[in-house]
């Protein structure tokens, strides 16, 4: 999968894209990262990429010209079509469902906004989607783009062992279960005995119940969309879940 990232600060991506899983995936040619400095596409002698807001106001706005030229060049560099996604607090909230969808694509173009924003004429002409990491504001889109590259890239086939992706948080509407490793007792706290029993079915059941409990305690809103069996719903109610308050449209399994 190819990622094209349009940014005013390409150096910010050096660490995240050259370490750990993303580095190995790039070396294995499973992922490609192409950084494009928007300033290189400014045509005036001062390489201006921003200007004051029309109509007045604070800050600066990114000019449409350099962004448009950069986008046109990037899109023409590869025959595969690609969504052009703007990082903006005004966009829909990025989540695991979107990450899974995008991981099936051959290519993704990410546009990093900065300053007060981007000229709306560029957005209307070139941007096909707009996403946010949540209800807060960053100084620019670079950190959001890094997060999206990591979240999407790790889901691309062969980047990770498929087993590593099973039962992750948000994978099926539930949070992940707690993890433990050696030693069996640390600082006076023991690993749950069931995990040392060797009984795989009981371990799987314990982990599933932990996922239910953790989701109820930390993100009860997620239960609205989770696929819950009758036994799951019974357990949750025993733990204080009020099903009606979480919505009436939960998907159910027998």
UniProtKB/Swiss-Prot annotation:
GO MF terms listed in the record are:
tRNA (guanine(37)-N1)-methyltransferase activity
Disulfide-bonded cysteine pairs: these are none
Record-listed E.C. numbers: 2.1.1.228
Q: Which InterPro entries match?
A: Alpha/beta_knot_MTases, tRNA_m1G_MeTrfase_C_sf, tRNA_m1G_MeTrfase_TrmD, tRNA_m1G_MTases_N, tRNA_MeTrfase_TRMD/TRM10
Sites where the protein binds S-adenosyl-L-methionine:
113, 133-138
Compartments in which it is found? Cytoplasm
Family matches, as Gene3D superfamilies: 3.40.1280.10, tRNA(m1g37)methyltransferase, domain 2 (1.10.1270.20)
Reactions accelerated catalytically: guanosine(37) in tRNA + S-adenosyl-L-methionine = N(1)-methylguanosine(37) in tRNA + S-adenosyl-L-homocysteine + H(+)
Entry keywords, A to Z: Cytoplasm, Methyltransferase, S-adenosyl-L-methionine, Transferase, tRNA processing
Q: Which domain of life is it from?
A: Bacteria
The record describes the protein's role as: Specifically methylates guanosine-37 in various tRNAs.
Q: How does it assemble?
A: Homodimer.
Give the family, as the similarity comment puts it: Belongs to the RNA methyltransferase TrmD family.
Q: Which protein, by its recorded name, is this?
A: tRNA (guanine-N(1)-)-methyltransferase
Q: Which organism is it from?
A: Herpetosiphon aurantiacus (strain ATCC 23779 / DSM 785 / 114-95)
């Amino acid at each position: 999968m190819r990622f094209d990232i349009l940014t005013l600060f390409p150096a910010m991506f050096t660490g995240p894209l050259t370490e750990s899983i993303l580095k190995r995936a790039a070396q294995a040619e499973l992922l490609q990262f192409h950084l494009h400095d928007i300033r290189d596409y400014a045509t005036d002698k001062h390489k201006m990429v921003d200007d004051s807001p029309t109509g007045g106001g604070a800050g600066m706005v990114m000019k449409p010209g350099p962004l448009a030229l950069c986008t046109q060049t990037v899109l023409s560099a590869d025959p595969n079509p690609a969504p052009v996604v703007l990082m903006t607090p005004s966009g829909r909230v990025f989540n695991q469902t979107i990450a899974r969808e995008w991981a099936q694509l051959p290519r993704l173009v990410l546009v990093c906004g900065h300053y007060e924003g981007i000229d709306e004429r560029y957005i209307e002409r070139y941007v096909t989607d707009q996403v946010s990491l949540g209800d807060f504001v960053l100084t620019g889109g670079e950190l959001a783009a890094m997060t999206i590259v990591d979240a999407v890239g790790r889901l691309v086939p062969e980047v990770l062992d498929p087993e590593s992706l099973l039962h992750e948080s948000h994978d099926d509407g539930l949070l992940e279960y707690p993890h433990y490793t050696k030693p069996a007792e640390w600082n006076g706290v023991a690993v749950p005995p069931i995990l040392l029993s060797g009984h795989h079915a009981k371990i799987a059941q314990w982990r599933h119940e932990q996922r239910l409990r953790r989701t109820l305690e930390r993100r009860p809103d997620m239960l609205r969309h989770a696929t819950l069996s009758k036994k799951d719903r019974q357990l949750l109610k025993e733990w204080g879940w009020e099903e009606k308050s979480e919505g009436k449209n939960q998907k159910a399994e027998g």
